[in-house]
C-alpha cells in the first residue's frame, strides 16, 4: 500500500535569527513529483514499512515502524552546501502480510525514482527490502533497454551485514534476499556480483558459508573490519568500485556493535565500528556510481536512547 509524503515527518529545531547558515535537513525536503532531471543530483527518500520478512524469519518484529523514526533522526542534522537536493516519495507499507505485493510496489516506486533522474534511499523495514530495491533497479534497466540501445551494465551489490542473508528456504523472508537475487541473476545470465562486509562467523551456519562460496560471494569477517584494518578494506573496496558500472548499497544495522545499535532484531556481540562503516560508505558515495541504497532492520521498539536511530542517520547523511 502506498502512503503519500507527509511533511510532518520532517521537523526539527529552528535557529532563525542566528548568524550564518542555520539550515537543517528538514529545511531541504520537497515532495517527489516524478520530475527531477532539471534539479541535478537528487536523493529521494522512500520508506518501506515492513517487518513481515522478519516475522517469517523468526526474528523480533517492530521494524515496520522504522521509516518515520529514521526520517526524524535525519531531519535535525545540519544541511550543507554540497548536499544533493532531497525529496521524499512517501512510504510503501506491508500491513496485511502480503510481503511479495509490497516488494513489487516498492520496486515500482524505485524504478520511477530512477527514471526521474533521482537516487533512491530506502528506509526499511526488515532486510527483505533488499529484494525490492534490487527489483527496482532491474525494472529500470529493462525499461531503459526497451527505450534505447543501452548496453548491459555491471552491478556491484555491497552489503554491510553480520549475515549473508543467503537462506534458500521459501517463502521469502528477511534472510533470503541475496539468494533470491542470485537466482534471478542466474536466470538472466548476468553475474551475481555480491560482496558482504562484516560477516560474523558465529552468526552464519557452515552451510551458509558453503553456499556463499558456491555463489562466488566475496566477504570480510567482522574481526577483519576493525579500525586498524580500514586502510586495507578501503583498498579492496576501491578495486571493486573500479570494476563496476553501478552500485547498490545496502546496510543492515545489525552489522554495528550492540552498544551502537541495540535497536535491531539480532544485536551484534562484536560488530563493525560505526567509524569503519561510515568511512566505507563515504567512499561508495564518492565513487559517483551509487544508484540506490537502503538502510534495514532498525527496530524502534528495541532502541535505547535512540542510539540506533542516530547511527543510522549518520550513515544516511553520508549518502545525501
Swiss-Prot record:
Binds 2 manganese ions per subunit. Its EC number is 3.5.3.8. Its cofactor is Mn(2+). Pathway: Amino-acid degradation; L-histidine degradation into L-glutamate; L-glutamate from N-formimidoyl-L-glutamate (hydrolase route): step 1/1. It comes from the Bacteria. The keyword Metal-binding applies. This is Formimidoylglutamase. The lineage of its organism: Bacteria, Pseudomonadati, Pseudomonadota, Betaproteobacteria, Burkholderiales. The gene is hutG.
